[in-house]
A protein has these predicted regions:
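Catalytic domains of carbohydrate-active enzymes that cleave complex glycans
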Residues: 4-5, 21-120
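Catalytic-core regions of glycoside hydrolase
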Residues: 1-19
Length: 120
């Protein structure tokens, strides 16, 4: 619907306060000392052997997998599969969309079944 070409998350490992005035421990201070929403300035935490993925990064990865599965289903069927995967939601926007874990997991199961049946 929106045909968004990409996504930019500006703060992969910004472990500082606003304007980089001081270095912070992101395990203890997740909002840049009040400069950002909690967890927003970084996607990974520092770890002893390299970066540790944040929950935000893991969920974003799942979202990208969902997008790829939707694109595959559309390519296999030749139609918009959104209404089948998320029935009853009508027009979705960036502000109005399904948010419950159960409904999102059920939607993914419907999508998986659609891809499976279209692949046979």
């Amino acid at each position: 619907k929106f045909q968004i070409a990409g996504f930019l998350h500006w703060g992969y490992n910004f472990w500082n306060s606003g304007l980089s005035r001081q270095r912070l421990n992101p395990w203890q201070v997740t909002d840049g000392n009040g400069a950002f929403p909690g967890g927003d300035p970084f996607s990974v935490y520092p770890g002893p052997e390299g970066p540790v993925q944040s929950l935000r990064m893991k969920v974003f990865h799942h979202g990208l997998q969902d997008l790829r599965a939707l694109e595959l289903a559309q390519a296999l069927t030749g139609r918009d599969v959104g209404p089948e995967v998320l029935p009853g939601y009508g027009e979705m926007t960036f502000a109005q969309y399904p948010q419950g874990a159960e409904e999102l997991l059920a939607a993914r199961e419907r999508l998986n079944a659609l891809v499976e049946s279209a692949s046979c």
